[in-house]
């Protein structure tokens, strides 16, 4: 980049079409966040009306994560074959329909199924919107593109909390889900008014890629076996999270079965680069395990342990959600300045200083609690805004939407486990202690996985012939592609 270009403010590097593409995707992600977090806000009301245990109620949050891996795969492949725009519109329609169905749900099973539909739509929205914006913006601004986009989810959560405080006390919890149908109108507007992503257009010129992940898995020579494994994974996840299994050994066996199936899919679809894909799933798994206990159960903690009324809960959640949204934007600037991995590690380390005080302070001073949550979520949750850029850099354009969608949403099963683990621990400890302990300990795992660039490192150990040495999105070198002590300029850029 020339000196003259560097002196131009970053936002002047973007034209009107690129800003319009971002605005449309950001609004879609805001609506996604709004619809997705509604269940967390009304969890106690739903639990009381349906007569659910705490673990059953938490499984309604988990349900959306169970179907995400399949939604990420299918809608991601749609984005790779037909373009990012169509996949994004389809995703919005799916999660909106699921939200409306929640409002009509007569009982636990019906609502669980509706949450499965929401999960599929959410997964598609994540993969398609992220690749759409990242591929539409200049390479040197793509951490900002990722961070700014993901902030929309947190803003959606803030809006949902405010709507909750106005709607639920007057019209009840079902009315909140009826509002979630509005995004379908937005989806119809999107279909006609936004351009296709630049990278996808340049790569294909209107032609479909040779093979997507769906082609490989469900139209290839192993299609029958893969369909059977897909059904087996869906059944196993159903029994793990909705079957009320009491035997931990059976749950563990079913979990290992699912892991084996997902690894098999990754090996088939990515070939020699499967170690990278598997490690990306592990990174995302632990990212959800450290962050989602708080995301999912914070409203319950505020209402039960701290005995806050709905208005106070909404105020505290505003600080939390707004902090995460600001953190996504800050993370985008940090990522373009320090580099994606270094920014991630520094932000998580800083967040560790705040997690214990958040749950130790109690509920006497709402404003202090709100400020602590703002900064903790800004540093700990907000930095996840650059996670799509981090993951997408390991995939070529042909498989980026499906690769990002599948790896991210398989790892997102950590979000399904997180609230249930938190609820189980809370049966022996108070909920605040359980949430703080989980988040504090598991954040360090993520710091190590990202800081050491374990996807590249494990790829180098197991299948070095397929090692990617540079980020496919911004061209920067992967630190894990060389042994410790090796010079970065020894790296040779690869295409695969």
UniProtKB/Swiss-Prot annotation:
Database matches in CDD domains: MFS_SV2_like
Transmembrane segments: 22-42, 58-78, 92-112, 116-136, 148-168, 170-190, 224-244, 247-267, 278-298, 313-333, 353-375, 406-426, 431-451
Entry annotated with the keyword Transmembrane helix: yes
SUPFAM superfamilies, A to Z: MFS general substrate transporter (SSF103473)
InterPro entries: MFS (IPR011701), MFS_dom (IPR020846), MFS_trans_sf (IPR036259), SA_transporter (IPR004742)
Membrane topology category: Multi-pass membrane protein
One annotated GO molecular function: carboxylic acid transmembrane transporter activity
Subcellular location: Cell inner membrane
Keyword Thylakoid: no
GO cellular component, one term: plasma membrane
Catalytic activity: N-acetylneuraminate(in) + H(+)(in) = N-acetylneuraminate(out) + H(+)(out)
Function: Catalyzes the proton-dependent transport of sialic acid.
Family statement: Belongs to the major facilitator superfamily. Sialate:H(+) symporter (SHS) (TC 2.A.1.12) family.
Name of the featured protein: Sialic acid transporter NanT
Organism of provenance: Escherichia coli O139:H28 (strain E24377A / ETEC)
């Amino acid at each position: 980049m020339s000196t003259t270009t560097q002196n131009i403010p970053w936002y002047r590097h973007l034209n009107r079409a690129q800003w319009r593409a971002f605005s449309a995707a950001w609004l879609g992600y805001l609506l996604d966040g709004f619809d997705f977090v509604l269940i967390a806000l009304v969890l106690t009301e739903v639990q009381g009306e349906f007569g659910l245990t705490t673990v059953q109620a938490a499984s309604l949050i988990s349900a959306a994560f169970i179907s995400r891996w399949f939604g990420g795969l299918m809608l991601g492949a749609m984005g790779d074959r037909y373009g990012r725009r169509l996949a994004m519109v389809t995703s919005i329609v799916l999660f909106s329909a699921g939200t409306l169905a929640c409002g009509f749900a007569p009982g636990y099973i019906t609502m669980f199924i509706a949450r499965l539909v929401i999960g599929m739509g959410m997964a598609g929205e994540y993969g398609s919107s992220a690749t759409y914006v990242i591929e539409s913006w200049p390479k040197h601004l793509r951490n900002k593109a990722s961070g700014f986009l993901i902030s929309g989810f947190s803003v959606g959560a803030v809006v949902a909390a405010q709507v909750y405080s106005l709607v639920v006390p007057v019209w009840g919890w079902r009315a909140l889900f009826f509002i979630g149908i509005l995004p379908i109108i937005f989806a119809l507007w999107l279909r006609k008014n936004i351009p296709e992503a630049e990278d996808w257009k340049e790569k294909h010129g209107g032609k479909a890629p040779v093979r997507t992940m769906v082609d490989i898995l469900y139209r290839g020579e192993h299609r029958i076996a893969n369909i059977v494994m897909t059904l087996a994974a869906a059944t196993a996840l159903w029994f793990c999270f909705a079957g009320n299994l009491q035997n931990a050994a059976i749950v563990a066996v079913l979990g290992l079965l699912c892991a084996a199936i997902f690894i098999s899919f990754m090996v088939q679809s990515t070939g020699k680069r499967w170690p990278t894909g598997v490690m990306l799933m592990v990174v995302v798994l632990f990212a959800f395990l450290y962050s989602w206990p708080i995301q999912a159960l914070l409203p319950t903690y505020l209402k039960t342990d701290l005995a806050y009324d709905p208005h106070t809960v909404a105020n505290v959640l505003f600080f939390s959600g707004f902090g995460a949204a600001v953190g996504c934007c800050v993370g985008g600037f940090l990522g373009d300045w320090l580099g994606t991995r270094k920014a991630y590690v520094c932000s998580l380390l800083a967040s560790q200083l705040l997690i214990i005080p958040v749950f130790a302070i109690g509920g006497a001073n709402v404003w202090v609690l709100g400020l602590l949550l703002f900064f903790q979520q800004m540093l700990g949750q907000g930095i996840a805004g650059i996670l799509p850029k981090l993951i997408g850099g390991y995939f070529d354009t042909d498989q980026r939407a499906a690769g990002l969608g599948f790896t991210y949403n398989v790892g997102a099963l950590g979000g399904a486990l997180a609230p249930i683990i938190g609820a189980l621990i809370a049966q022996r400890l108070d909920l605040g202690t359980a949430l703080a302990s989980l988040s504090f300990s598991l954040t360090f795992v993520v710091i190590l996985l990202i800081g050491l660039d374990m996807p590249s490192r494990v790829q180098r150990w197991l299948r070095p012939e397929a090692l990617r040495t540079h980020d496919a999105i911004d061209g920067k070198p992967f630190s894990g592609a060389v042994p410790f002590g090796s010079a970065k300029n020894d790296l040779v850029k690869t295409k695969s």
